[in-house]
Amino acid sequence: MAFQVNTNINALNAHAMGLVTQRELKESLERLSSGLRINKAADDASGMTIADSLRSQAKSLGQAIANTNDGMGIIQIADKAMDEQIKILDTIKVKATQAAQDGQNTQSRKALQADIVRLIQSLDNIGNTTSYNGQTLLSGAFSNKEFQVGAYSNETIKASIGSATSDKIGQVKITTGKNITASGEVALTFKQVDGVHDVSLESVKISTSAGTGLGVLAEVINKNSNATGVRATANVITTSDSAIKSGSLSSLTVNGIEIGNILGIKKNDSDGRLVAALNAVTAQTGVEAYTDSVGRLNLRSIDGRGINIKANSTNVDGQASALTTLNGGQDITRGSTNFGRLSLVRQDARDILVVSGANVSASAGYAAIGFAKGTTANTTVNLRDVLGEFNQAVRSASGANYNKTLASENLTLGSGVTTLRGAMVVMDIAESAQKMLDKVRSDLGSVQNQMVSTVNNITITQVNVKAAESQIRDVDFAQESANFSKNNILAQSGSYAMSQANTVQQNILRLLT
């Protein structure tokens, strides 16, 4: 055993171990005071990288939750505004329905129209002023907007809000065929009703017999309107080309029912003799007669069957014939036949493609019901059009020109609900507008539900990401307290060991005494 004075190996070892203990004690105190296991990169280089990534992800998820909540707020604002617009449209339709009966006079219809104008202005005011953070929501400008709903780029939800102003909603496609003058069997097919599929309807006979005619065809079309999106109205009205003259009608027949001779008919049928004779057999003919404001005879089919009226040219008791031509030039002595006009309405404004069967091209049309190419009256109207006057094109397309006699007058349909037919057009427009807004709201509801699901998911994800970061970054106090106690004891024992190592050197002095 060697004894040295210049180098105290035991003291040096004790000092070195004391330094290690002091460093570990310092790190332990740092962790206990900060609550973090990783306070600097040297503590855990790879763990710090992962923890920082998780922290960034958690913070981004927090902002994504805020973004999604903002998006839901926007949708809720738009949804409530459109809910109010739909209530306005309900009122417009009710007022149009109120105007669509001839118990209303011109003044009452004008009052209803004034109410409707105000309501449309209110609807437009909502559409133009509903906004979020300076962005209008219902003008059509809020389209294809994106909301970041994830921690990483391009994790988005898109939302669009369609226009809800009167010039963009309520589009209605109105189509009316020409007057039908030929009988026959009709079997219709509506082409590409949903853009792809065709819908074929049962066949209907067009004639003057009961249980036939455009009235039955309209019922068949309306029965299938859920599949086709098309509704139909049959207008079968025969009108004399001129006012009723003083005279007589010989051997008068309507739809095969003989009425006989009618004598002493006065001008404009002022005493109602002709109308009374015709209406006496309404149950057999299915035809109702009346005179209009200018003294013309009008025959209306009450069930939509065709109308055939005929009288001999022979004068009775020297009296001239009270009627000569009807329906734009049809001679009563040869027989005037009219099967009416079929009006079709589609509330999404797409073209109505109607043909005779699945093997006929859509462009061919179907002449038997008046829809041959070039012979139909087509137009599209929207809610904004209700504010002004419906023009002659709308009048014809809506079926208000029941026959050539009325069409030749080139009249307009008036403003909004100021006429019976105009009121019915407004009813269709209001219903179409309601459906359009309901579709927009339905789409927004789906987007909002998507956002709710996303928020629920990323909220849980954020919690789990923070938990994962905590596992890496945060200190385990129980474990670290044990480490601190160990290092504290080692520091104290190290100091004692160094003191003893220095004392050992004094034993050399005993060798010198």
Swiss-Prot record:
Coiled coil: none annotated. It is found in: Secreted; Bacterial flagellum. Keywords: Bacterial flagellum, Secreted, Virulence. One of its GO terms (cellular component) is extracellular region. Gene3D superfamilies: 3.30.70.2120, f41 fragment of flagellin, N-terminal domain, Flagellar export chaperone, C-terminal domain. One of its GO terms (molecular function) is structural molecule activity. It comes from the Bacteria. NCBIfam families: PRK12584.1, PRK13588.1. Belongs to the bacterial flagellin family. Heteromer of FlaA and FlaB. FlaB is located proximal to the hook while the remainder of the filament is composed of the predominant FlaA. Flagellin is the subunit protein which polymerizes to form the filaments of bacterial flagella. Important for motility and virulence. This is Flagellin A. It comes from Helicobacter felis (strain ATCC 49179 / CCUG 28539 / NCTC 12436 / CS1). The gene is flaA.
